[in-house]
Amino acid sequence: INEYKKFLADIGYLHPRSNNFSIKTSNVDPEIRKIAGPQLVVPVMNARFALNATNARWGSLYDALYGTDMISESEGAIREGGYNPIRGDRVIAFAKNFLDETFPLENGTFNKATNFEFIDSEIVITLNDGSKTHLLNKDQYIGYMDKGEGAYGLLFKNNNLHIEIQVDRSHPIGQDDLAGIKDILVESAITTIQDCEDSVAAVDDEDKIIVYRNWLGLMKGDLKRSFNKNGKYLTRELNGDRRYLLKNGKMILLPGRSL
């Protein structure tokens, strides 16, 4: 045992006992270091799955609510077939209640919001009675994205995760909304495991070539796949980063893809 311990000490594996100390790491991505959120596992051998998972960093709250059992199908709110306005109304009500809970206002609710303005680096919300209100926690408002032709996105932050309220009064959903909100984007899948072993078995040379080709496309950012879905020809490719104007006038880039 002494010879073994000496060997471990000689190669630097064992060190003499020392006083208490702390270890500090650097250059660790915030997705690993401080952001708590969902993680996806996907077979990288399937390019469409790999693209979908990587792009799941941001997702539509309206779509997620409409297409799942988070919203009941009772009293005519079924989700099959074309757009169901009864279900759509429930989705929007749920989403705005979520905004009220996550980004509470000093007075009123998002359900009664009719307009958003930017005054002295703050967001001012007009309610349907004509009164003005602000966020209870003004630090939750982060920035703004101009999308042209009167459309814009409002960026908020809670627990290190971002949410974008998308305003577009020309959109079919935004047209019927008091504040012109067409959707709410939620920062969702923070990290993705691109799997080569557990969710897929890549064992021979052909399989491994597919895996590494897809992985190279992810690393270079040029992976894309085209396919036919319900008679429509679609192309899936990687999302770009999201650019916002901060309250202080500076620009910020947020990742458009999961780590």
Label for each model-derived stretch:
Residues 5, 13, 17-259:
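Active-site-facing alpha/beta catalytic cores
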